[in-house]
Amino acid sequence: MSRRIRRRSGIGLGAGPLALVGAMAVSGVIHLVRPAVFERAVPRAMPGSARGWVLVSGVAELACAATTLWPPTRAVGGLASAALMAGVFPANVQMTLDARRPRTRAITLLRLPLQIPLVLWGLQAARSTPR
Protein backbone atom coordinates (compact mmCIF):
# COMPACT_ATOMS: atom_id res chain seq x y z
CA MET A 1 0.00 0.00 0.00
CA SER A 2 2.83 2.36 0.80
CA ARG A 3 4.23 2.05 -2.72
CA ARG A 4 0.89 2.84 -4.33
CA ILE A 5 0.57 6.00 -2.32
CA ARG A 6 4.12 6.97 -3.20
CA ARG A 7 3.46 6.60 -6.92
CA ARG A 8 0.07 8.24 -6.82
CA SER A 9 1.10 11.16 -4.61
CA GLY A 10 4.34 11.81 -6.43
CA ILE A 11 5.82 13.28 -3.26
CA GLY A 12 7.75 10.24 -2.06
CA LEU A 13 6.05 9.78 1.30
CA GLY A 14 4.86 6.42 2.58
CA ALA A 15 1.40 5.92 4.05
CA GLY A 16 2.45 6.56 7.66
CA PRO A 17 4.26 9.86 7.11
CA LEU A 18 1.50 10.99 4.76
CA ALA A 19 -1.07 10.22 7.47
CA LEU A 20 1.05 12.25 9.91
CA VAL A 21 1.05 15.23 7.53
CA GLY A 22 -2.73 15.01 7.11
CA ALA A 23 -3.38 14.66 10.83
CA MET A 24 -1.11 17.58 11.66
CA ALA A 25 -2.70 19.79 9.02
CA VAL A 26 -6.23 19.05 10.25
CA SER A 27 -5.25 19.41 13.89
CA GLY A 28 -3.40 22.67 13.20
CA VAL A 29 -6.46 24.18 11.54
CA ILE A 30 -8.71 23.06 14.42
CA HIS A 31 -6.28 24.61 16.92
CA LEU A 32 -6.65 27.94 15.14
CA VAL A 33 -10.38 27.80 14.42
CA ARG A 34 -11.58 26.30 17.72
CA PRO A 35 -8.82 26.92 20.28
CA ALA A 36 -11.16 26.49 23.25
CA VAL A 37 -11.28 22.76 22.50
CA PHE A 38 -7.59 22.47 23.40
CA GLU A 39 -7.16 25.06 26.15
CA ARG A 40 -7.77 22.64 29.01
CA ALA A 41 -5.02 20.40 27.65
CA VAL A 42 -2.35 23.03 28.31
CA PRO A 43 -0.59 21.98 31.52
CA ARG A 44 -1.16 24.51 34.29
CA ALA A 45 2.59 24.78 34.86
CA MET A 46 3.07 26.42 31.45
CA PRO A 47 3.67 30.18 31.65
CA GLY A 48 1.35 32.54 29.81
CA SER A 49 -2.17 31.98 28.57
CA ALA A 50 -3.52 28.63 27.50
CA ARG A 51 -5.02 30.29 24.40
CA GLY A 52 -1.60 31.55 23.36
CA TRP A 53 -0.06 28.09 23.67
CA VAL A 54 -2.90 26.55 21.68
CA LEU A 55 -2.51 29.07 18.86
CA VAL A 56 1.27 28.67 18.77
CA SER A 57 0.94 24.89 18.69
CA GLY A 58 -1.58 25.14 15.84
CA VAL A 59 0.83 27.23 13.79
CA ALA A 60 3.63 24.79 14.67
CA GLU A 61 1.55 21.83 13.49
CA LEU A 62 0.77 23.53 10.19
CA ALA A 63 4.44 24.45 9.71
CA CYS A 64 5.53 20.89 10.47
CA ALA A 65 2.96 19.47 8.07
CA ALA A 66 4.06 21.80 5.27
CA THR A 67 7.79 21.26 5.78
CA THR A 68 7.35 17.49 6.03
CA LEU A 69 5.33 17.41 2.83
CA TRP A 70 7.76 19.52 0.75
CA PRO A 71 10.78 17.40 -0.30
CA PRO A 72 13.46 20.13 0.05
CA THR A 73 12.51 20.69 3.72
CA ARG A 74 11.38 17.16 4.55
CA ALA A 75 14.37 16.20 6.69
CA VAL A 76 13.93 19.20 8.98
CA GLY A 77 10.13 18.94 8.85
CA GLY A 78 10.12 15.26 9.75
CA LEU A 79 12.43 15.82 12.71
CA ALA A 80 10.41 18.85 13.84
CA SER A 81 7.20 16.82 13.51
CA ALA A 82 8.64 13.99 15.60
CA ALA A 83 9.81 16.48 18.24
CA LEU A 84 6.44 18.23 18.31
CA MET A 85 4.54 14.96 18.64
CA ALA A 86 6.80 13.97 21.54
CA GLY A 87 6.52 17.46 23.02
CA VAL A 88 2.72 17.55 23.12
CA PHE A 89 2.57 14.26 25.00
CA PRO A 90 2.32 16.05 28.39
CA ALA A 91 -0.71 17.98 27.12
CA ASN A 92 -2.35 14.71 26.06
CA VAL A 93 -1.67 13.28 29.52
CA GLN A 94 -3.20 16.42 31.04
CA MET A 95 -6.34 15.98 28.92
CA THR A 96 -6.65 12.41 30.20
CA LEU A 97 -6.21 13.49 33.82
CA ASP A 98 -8.75 16.30 33.43
CA ALA A 99 -11.38 14.22 31.62
CA ARG A 100 -14.59 14.20 33.62
CA ARG A 101 -16.69 11.79 31.61
CA PRO A 102 -15.72 8.10 31.42
CA ARG A 103 -16.07 8.08 27.62
CA THR A 104 -13.84 11.14 27.24
CA ARG A 105 -11.28 9.66 29.62
CA ALA A 106 -11.28 6.39 27.64
CA ILE A 107 -10.77 8.20 24.33
CA THR A 108 -7.95 10.37 25.66
CA LEU A 109 -6.33 7.37 27.33
CA LEU A 110 -6.44 5.36 24.10
CA ARG A 111 -4.87 8.29 22.26
CA LEU A 112 -1.73 8.28 24.41
CA PRO A 113 -0.03 5.26 22.78
CA LEU A 114 -0.85 6.70 19.34
CA GLN A 115 1.88 9.29 19.90
CA ILE A 116 4.46 6.54 19.33
CA PRO A 117 3.65 5.91 15.64
CA LEU A 118 3.30 9.67 15.06
CA VAL A 119 6.84 10.23 16.34
CA LEU A 120 8.12 7.27 14.31
CA TRP A 121 6.38 8.51 11.15
CA GLY A 122 8.04 11.89 11.58
CA LEU A 123 11.42 10.18 11.80
CA GLN A 124 10.55 8.01 8.79
CA ALA A 125 9.64 11.10 6.78
CA ALA A 126 12.97 12.72 7.70
CA ARG A 127 14.82 9.64 6.45
CA SER A 128 12.85 9.58 3.18
CA THR A 129 14.29 12.89 2.03
CA PRO A 130 15.31 12.71 -1.64
CA ARG A 131 19.08 12.89 -2.02
Region spans (language model):
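Short amphipathic, positively biased membrane-proximal segments
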Residues: 1-131
